[in-house]
Structures are given as structure tokens and as C-alpha cells.
């Protein structure tokens, strides 16, 4: 708005005085300044104040005295004397009339019969008419604005353009707005004033006379403004008006700028206000407000703001660049001045060339960047990156030259200096077009050479672990491996912004790096000499040596140039702490891959060396003693977990690549089992579980490796037990820990065990105290506990001691399971073996898990110790599977050698070995099950002691009669132990059956004593799966298997009365009927005598089978009777009774206890087998009838 250039605006001093009603400051104003504020001051002096205080009364007197000498006050007083109510009514009528006429000019109610022009009319009019003239003109403009639909127009108005009457028109405008606020909202008036000449001046006067409306007016103008103000006349006028307002009230300029960003309107205004603010602020060495503001817009998180401002930059570049009046040009000029203001003074290429000859290498003739300018220089670089990369700014030649001068300057060795060099380097990569001449390219190469030479010095002086040297090395490696996308990601990450970089733009930089500065051999040799990062953790950000080593390992540079990297990696693993750095696990994985697989087939020996066993053991020294020795440990838990991850991953990868390595005739060394036995794997996993948040994905990776290679350490029961041991209850109990409990030594525990036959109290007391210790603190007592377990098998040891030992063993099992199992198995050997000193190793037990069951027979009747034995058996069965799988993979070369001359192809040997392994595992599992089932049988001694013990196996649901004598109490105890052991075994068998249903089928096809069927069916919930294969078992040719199948089915039908059971029972009845017709006399007796009682169970479970079963029984009786009839006719009465039983069961049911039926089973052994079978049939029918009649 150049038309306002000759007018006097309200000064910031005067506006502040009006805001604060500072009468003293107002009195100090000059007459021209005071003239602009008269409307408000006169109203203030004449209107009744709300403030009735004495101080305001004094101030009001000063204001009246101030106004008394001003001539224009009289005209303003006359304006205030008008009837504004009538004026408002007339204005409302005119508005309604204009609305009816469609906005046409028409006849005005406010002003009628204008004799002359508006200016002359205003001059000759009195105060009321002047008010009407201005109001009519203002309402007309406001109506036109509301009808314009956002299109800007400039309204010609004599009243607002005549320089003679501007002040009087402004007085009238201010009075009208103050007296008629509902008719003339100040925001609408402000919007209308933008459309007239001198509108900005009128707007400033209006706001100055209503200072409280400043923020409201500014927000309204911004909200109604254009998204891009530089593109239109209206936008530029709006920006200029708001800029004048902010000059009048500079304290609110930044708040107005915030409104601009919030609304995403008028970007030029935001920049202009920032430029005004930058000129006013003191010129210090810090980052300017302009740099901060523009950086915040382009690098902030609000994508809408970023797009809006980027559009402003792009549109501004499309206009003429020499348009000095544009805000964008002013911004670029200011930024360039700031950039040039911090540049070093001496910057000449030829000086450097002379320096290379005449000066020492450590002396630089460059004027380095001043330390106080480094942060500002970094901020400017990032801003220019954002302007060029995000907003699309195309730098001028001057800007490009100055930017390159700044980027290749040399900062001091401080953390900020390291950051500046990193930013400069990434900016060179991102915007290689800044280097356009050979001289500039030479300057860049020299600067890069200086970076290489100085990076170690910078790192040592600045104390920053992430130096720019690692970034240089990393970029060089990426260029050598042609990973241009990785370089782009690196640049964007360092600059902190996502910008588009074309890979083709990096071609020249790639040539410079790979041929002039960093050859691959130089990169590799330099990388291995880079010191490891001390206390490496995720808290250390930036690009570190580990990133460089990782990339070199991936590209196989170390093996290609025969550089050993093993020691560097080992040192770095030893220098780690929590939180875990995310690059460590990928580094270990790629290192393992470089050990096992050569870089090329032509050179199979080109691999890295693995970490030695002694180096691995060094990391875990002092750990086997438990938690009480942790302070003496040399290495952190992070290092130990990483080395454990390395060992487990190495072994897994070695097994996975066995075939490939065998084909290449390579066999890398595997770590010995002795080494693995010395690593406390479970203890370390427990430690990792408590540090999951700090270890990132390491804990889950270790669990995966453990489940694959050490399934016996991932038993579900162990995890559940561990939750109980480490839970709240255990923590509360540990709070009861006394000094006495802590003072018990393993030696005292041994002495207490030695006193066992006579004194139980001391041992019980020590064991109870030990239960309060944590798992790690119990480790020193493990050997004493296990070595004395054999003593606990003697008679008279209290059950409480056994249970406490079991509890302590389970706690120790959470931290040292493998060593604990070996010690326990050796301790529970029979006495004869202990004398021979036959000690089993971990390897022995994995090869033959059944060793666990070759323990002292007394263990089989000690439930707490049997629980431990079963736990170990389950673990070693799982370990044996993993061991055999690993062994199969380790010996894969045996598959390859024969297959080379085998016409059958390479698959045949592998399938055979796999089948052999599966057969061995099946035999092993089934043998374990058969031994456990045998343990469930009562011994001859137990049978002799109590007949009720044996009857328990017949019926699980039967209850024992109460005993009264003291001798029977001992039998009851024996029965209780046997029952408890049976329950423990059934629980384990259930788990094994669920884990592998094939075991169930194999065991039942092998068969076991029928006395155990009642126990297994009732005690093992998964026995119902036997229904799937019973038809196949019945179809076997062996008579014993058929009998066993029918007996098993009878118990299953009672336990699981399902439709499937019914169908299988029908099949069994049909098979029995078929066999009746084909079996010889001896086989018929052998088959039907044990299976006939099963028919009672079928009938009990499924009453619909009654008719079929009765028919079968009659058929059996008839067949047997026919054989007897050939010898004698005395058998007819039995056949007659059988027919009566079938035809009239209700009549006979009451007589079942009479002598004819009661004597049917007597003297069975003294008669012919057919007679015995007939009597058994009769007994079975009677039992079925009794059952059906009684409703059982």
C-alpha cells in the first residue's frame, strides 16, 4: 500500500500508552501523534467511567487538561452529541432496503439529495450528516465485500481518498464503530477498509482507538485471508495492513505470526513479520529468529504446514527473481547475509595448494569456523537443505558459492563441530549440484581429505563417540558395494528430513570416493584399526564403528583382503551395556555367516575366524557361583547374553548349513559339549527376562534358539514353577529372611545330613531356612543337596524333609537345570553302582535317557523324589530328540558321499537315516512308558501286605474300608505312596501322549498288564484317543492283542460314553461273534474267558446294545453246549436256564441269589473248559440283568 507512505501512523510508543492508559506518556506525545488518538481520548473524558477510584479521577483531569488545547476536540464532541439510536434505526432500514433491491445503490435513507460530490458534501455538512455520509459509504463497501465471494476489488471513494479530510473521516469512523458496535463489527469494518485507498492507515487508527481489539482484528483478517498472499493484489494489501498493525504493536507480532501458521494463510506475512523482528532484535552470534521460524515450518511434524510453506517458496520462484519487493527475495537476501556473516575470511584454493608444499601436515592456513558460529552454521545448513530438498528452492550462483564455502569450512574440535562436519558432508552428498566447477571439486576433495586426517583428533578432543570418521567409512563402503539407497537413507537420517535424492546424482561422488579417497583395501585396513565404542548402548546415537564393521562384513571385504576382524568384534561385545544397541544382533548374525560360508566358491577358505572357546569361557567366569558372586564379575550381563546368543546362533547356523559345507568339503569347528555345559544358560535367560525392555529383541531371540536347540530347558512346567518362585508370595516370604538363615553354610548342611538317622530337627530347620533364599543364592548348596538324596531313601525319614528337598530342587532347577540333573541322577543310583563310582555325564544321559529310571528302587515309592525323577526323565527325552536331530545334521556328509555314485539319487540315504532316527526315538519313548507303567504295579511284597492294595488297580473309583489297627496304618501309608506315584506317572504320560499321539498307539499295540487298564483310563485324560486305533488293534491276528483291545475298550466306554465309543463297541461285539465261529475249543476258551466281563461294561455304558450282547452270550453258550453234547446229555439244563434268562429276565432277576444261579461259578476249575465258559456266560447274563433291573 504505497498510497499510505506519506501518512503518519500511530507509533508503538503511543499505542502502548493507549493500551495501558498511561496519561503521563500520552502527555509526552507530540500534537500530530495525539491528533490520531483524539476519538478515544474524547470519549474517555466525556463518558461516565466504570472506574470510580481517586487515581482515575486524577488521570481524567490530566486528560481533560491535555485535550483543552486541541481545536479538533470540539468537532469530535459534536459527533458524540448525535442521536445514535435514530442513526442505527435508519441504517438498519437502509440495509433492509438494499437487501430487497438486491444490493443496488438505489435511494439512501441515511443520505438523500446529495447536491455535490461526497467530499464537498462532507465539508459543508454538520456532525449528524457527516456521520450519515461515512456510515452510508462504509455500509455500501461492507455489503459489496459480503457479496464478492472472496474476489478482491478496490472501491474508489472520495471520502477515504481526499488527503484534506482524512483525519475528520477517521474521527467519524472511530466514533461510529465505538457507538454502533453491533451494526459495525470491528472485524467487518477492518475487512472493508482493505478495499479502499489508505485502508491500512484507517485500520491502524481504528485499532489504536480501540486497542483491546488488536488480536481480534488480526485473527479475523488472517482467517479471511488467502492461502498464498504473494499471488494476488488483495493478499499483498492484507499482508501490508497486518504488517502495519504489527509495527504499531510489535510485542504481539510473533503472536500474529503464530496465527498465520495456525490458519495456514498469508505465508508472506509470517516471513515479513519475522524479517521485521530480526531487524529489531540484537545482532548476536546465536541462531536468528528467521532461521528458527522457517526451519520449524519445513522440518516440523505438521505436514499441512510444510506443504503450505513449500508452495509459497515454489510460487515465489516462478515470478521474476529481481523483484526486490517480494517477501521471498527479502528472506533469501537476509539468509545469505547471515551465512556470509559467519564465513571464515580466508578462503582461497591456491593458498591450500601452497600450503600442501610449504607447511607441515598438521598446520592449516584455512581460517577455521569460529566456535561461537558453529551451531548457527549447522542450523543454516539444515535450513538450506530443507529449502532445497523439501520446498524446491533453486539456489542462485551466489547462494551456491557461499554455501559451498561454508560447508567446506573447518570447525573447532567440539561436539558441535563434529555435528557440523557430518551435516556438511551429508549436504554435499544430497546436493552434489552445488559443486559445478573443477575448482569447487578440488576444494571438496581437499576438505574430504582433511576429514579423514582429522577424524581421530576430533574424536579424542571432542569426546564424541559417534565421529564423522565412521560416517565417511560407512559411505565409502556403501559406494564400494553400490548400495546407493543406503547412502540416501543415511543422508536423510543425518539431516533429519526426508528429501528426494536421485541415485544418478551420486555418480560423481562415487567416483571420487572409490578411486581417489577410499579404495576398498584402504577402507578395510582402516576399519579394523578403529577403536571399539566404550560402553556401547542404544543411548549412543549417530554412526559408530559398529555400523562400518557391519557393512564391511556384509560385503565380505575382510575375507576378501584377508583382514582378521574376530578380535575387534569380541572386544566390542565385551564393551556393551544396556539398553542394547540395535546394531549388535545384526552384527553377530552377519559375522557368523562370514565364518561359515565363504565369500566365493573359487576361494572356499576365505572366511573369518570364530571366537575361541577360551574367550567365551572368560566371559562367563565367576558366574557359576550364583548371584552372590556377581559383584566380582568382569563382564556385564549384556556381554554375557550377547556371547550366549553368538554361541547358540553359531551352532544353529552350523547345523543348518551342514549339507552346503559338506558339498564344499568344508567342516568348520563346532563348540564342544564341555563348553556348553559350563555356560549357565538358564540362569542367563532368567536374567534376560527381567531386562526385556532394555534388551530389545535379544530375549525373544534367545528363547527361540533355546526352544530349537535346548527344548529340555523350555519345559512348560519349569516356566510355571519359575513364576511361582519369582512371584509376590516368594518376595514376601523372602522378607522374613533372618541373619541365621543367611549364615548356614553348605558344610553345616552336610553335617545335618550326616545326623539324619537319629536327628531330623536340625536338618529340617536348615532346609526351611534355605527355602527363603533366592535361586541364585541356593547354587552353592546344590552339590550337598543332591549328593545326600540317597540318604533320604532310608526308612524313618519324615515326609516334610522329602517335600522340602523337592521344593529346593525345583528352585535350583530354574537356574542350573543341566548340572543339577547330572548330579541328581548320579546320586540316586543303586548302592552297588555308587560303590563302583560309575558317574554319568550330560552326554551319556542325552544318548540314553532311560538311565534316569535305573535308579534305586526305593525312589519308586518316594513321591517327592519320584517327582524329581520324572521331571528329569521328561527333560532328557526332549534333550535326546534334539541331540539326535543335531547328530543327523552333523553327519549329513555321509548322505552326500554315497549318493555321488548312487543311481537311486541323493534322497534315499537321507530318508533311511531319518526313519532310523524316528524309530529309535519311538522305541526310546515307548520303553520309558512301559517302565513307568511297570512301576505302577504293586510289588509282590505290597500284594502280600494288603489285598486291598491290589484291588485298587481293579477299580479306581472304589473306596477302601476304614482301618483300625496300628499295623494297618503302615499299609495305608504304603497305599498312599503307591497311589501318589501312580498319579505323578499318569500326569507325565498324559503330557507325553498329548505331545506325540503316536506313542499312545505304539504302547497299546505293544500291550501292558490288563490290571493297569483301570488306572490308565481313569488317570490319563488323553486315553480317549485310543478309540481312533482300537478297530485296527482288534483286527490284529494275535489273540492277545484282540483280548487287550476289547478289555481297553470296555474301560473307555465307561469313562467316555460317546457316539464314537458306541460304534467301536458294536464293532467289538461283531468281531466277537465272528471269532466264535472260527476259533478252536482251546482258543475259544482263552479268548472269551477274559473278554466276557467286558460285555457287562458295554451294556452298562450303552443299554441299546443289550439285545446284541444277549444274543452273543446265548450263541456262545450254544456253541459250547453243542461240543459238550457230543459227549454227554447232562448239559441241557444249563442251556434251558440260559434261554429262560434271555426270555424272562424279570422273573429270574429276583432269583439270582438262589442256589441254581449262585452255584454257577463254583467248582469252575474242576470241570471241562466248555462247561467253565458256559458258567461264565451264565454269570455274565445274571450280572447284566441285575445291572439293568437295579438301574445301575
Curated annotation (Swiss-Prot):
Cell compartment(s), UniProt: Nucleus; Nucleus membrane; Cytoplasm
Subunit structure: Component of the Integrator complex, composed of core subunits INTS1, INTS2, INTS3, INTS4, INTS5, INTS6, INTS7, INTS8, INTS9/RC74, INTS10, INTS11/CPSF3L, INTS12, INTS13, INTS14 and INTS15. The core complex associates with protein phosphatase 2A subunits PPP2CA and PPP2R1A, to form the Integrator-PP2A (INTAC) complex.
Keyword Transmembrane helix: yes
Name of one Pfam family that matches: INTS2
Record key words, sorted: Cytoplasm, Membrane, Nucleus, Transmembrane, Transmembrane helix
Record function comment: Component of the integrator complex, a multiprotein complex that terminates RNA polymerase II (Pol II) transcription in the promoter-proximal region of genes.
Transmembrane intervals: 420-436
Provenance organism: Gallus gallus
InterPro entries cross-referenced by the UniProt entry: Int2_metazoa (IPR026236), INTS2 (IPR029321)
Disulfide bond entries: none
Bilayer topology term: Single-pass membrane protein
Name the record gives this protein: Integrator complex subunit 2
Any one GO cellular component localisation term in the record: nuclear membrane
